[in-house]
Amino acid sequence: MSERGNRKTQIGVVVSDKMDKTVVVKVDRLIKHSVYNKYIKRSAKYKAHDVDNSCKTGDRVLIVETRPMSKDKRWKVRQIIERNA
């Protein structure tokens, strides 16, 4: 994989698994407000390809950037870090 370049990775929580071979992953990040110097939580939702339909809602997953697979899907689930109990 190193010869193709570094791909972006994100860690997030699965919020929806209702689509076939697709999950919606919510990724949280902290940004610092420029005026008030307070940290604010921002989140983004990404649609990710799940080949085996193995991810369930609440799972913590690692997603990696990949080629566009559809209009909205540009990420792929690499591994499930933590299962939802």
Curated annotation (Swiss-Prot):
The keyword Ribonucleoprotein applies. Disulfide bonds: none annotated. The keyword Transmembrane does not apply. Gene3D superfamilies: Nucleic acid-binding proteins. InterPro entries: NA-bd_OB-fold, Ribosomal_uS17, Ribosomal_uS17_bact/chlr. One of its GO terms (biological process) is translation. GO terms for cellular component: cytosolic small ribosomal subunit. Keywords: Ribonucleoprotein, Ribosomal protein, RNA-binding, rRNA-binding. Coiled coil: none annotated. Part of the 30S ribosomal subunit. Belongs to the universal ribosomal protein uS17 family. One of the primary rRNA binding proteins, it binds specifically to the 5'-end of 16S ribosomal RNA. This is Small ribosomal subunit protein uS17. It comes from Geotalea daltonii (strain DSM 22248 / JCM 15807 / FRC-32) (Geobacter daltonii). The gene is rpsQ.
